[in-house]
Amino acid sequence: MAKLTKRMRVIRDKVDVTKQYDINEAVALLKELATAKFVESVDVAVNLGIDARKSDQNVRGATVLPHGTGRSVRVAVFAQGANAEAAKEAGAELVGMDDLADQIKKGEMNFDVVIASPDAMRVVGQLGQILGPRGLMPNPKVGTVTPNVAEAVKNAKAGQVRYRNDKNGIIHTTIGKVDFDSDKLKENLESLVVALKKAKPATAKGIYIKKISLSTTMGAGVAIDQSGLTAVVN
């Protein structure tokens, strides 16, 4: 049997895996247990009452968190003409067409988000095997294929998170950093829950938001008592 590290023993002793924690209590506990030498992210897992095997019950989208994610995001944009200029003015680090595609084909991918105007998809389409496996392929469902590339760049910079359920019907994303104030983490979580509720498939039956858990990058998951979340109750 693998030997528990000191950190794992502390987590085991502090976290009650049978309990659903009030959001403020959960955040305080995560902050206490976040002892890594870097500022850990606060990640969320939301178990949805969907059948992920059915395409009409898959949940996918994007939302801008009110307090951002705490990450500095580098944005690449495929656009030309006025759209290219607008993307640059909005703060995109990389803007281009075939020249940008050539960089990516060479393995030069110093960016976190890729946005494309619809007329640029003829170029982006060649990059599916490179961008797809990395979760970077632009998609209209999450607002990264859009005629308004400037707005998409601003959203990405402002702390937009993209979400998509896995094969078990669970959404995994981040809601900030462990050094955020508790109120900001709570409001970010509630904003995500509102977005997920709006994205509820019409064919999903029964309880939709089944379970919410928070964790830090290096920490254990803490189940959240949903009754303390305004977005769930209302």
Curated annotation (Swiss-Prot):
Coiled-coil stretches noted in the UniProt entry, renumbered to this chain: none
GO cellular component assignments: cytosolic large ribosomal subunit
PROSITE patterns per UniProt: RIBOSOMAL_L1 (PS01199)
InterPro entries per record: Ribosom_uL1_bac-type (IPR005878), Ribosomal_uL1 (IPR002143), Ribosomal_uL1-like (IPR023674), Ribosomal_uL1/biogenesis (IPR028364), Ribosomal_uL1_3-a/b-sand (IPR016095), Ribosomal_uL1_CS (IPR023673)
Molecular function GO terms recorded: rRNA binding; structural constituent of ribosome; tRNA binding
Keyword Heme: no
GO terms classed as biological process: regulation of translation; translation
Swiss-Prot/TrEMBL keywords: Repressor, Ribonucleoprotein, Ribosomal protein, RNA-binding, rRNA-binding, Translation regulation, tRNA-binding
SUPFAM superfamilies cross-referenced by the UniProt entry: Ribosomal protein L1 (SSF56808)
Transmembrane segments: none
Superkingdom of origin organism: Bacteria
PANTHER family: 54S RIBOSOMAL PROTEIN L1, MITOCHONDRIAL, LARGE RIBOSOMAL SUBUNIT PROTEIN UL1M
Subunit structure: Part of the 50S ribosomal subunit.
Family that this chain belongs to: Belongs to the universal ribosomal protein uL1 family.
Function, in words: Binds directly to 23S rRNA. The L1 stalk is quite mobile in the ribosome, and is involved in E site tRNA release. Protein L1 is also a translational repressor protein, it controls the translation of the L11 operon by binding to its mRNA.
The protein, known as: Large ribosomal subunit protein uL1
Protein encoded by which gene: rplA
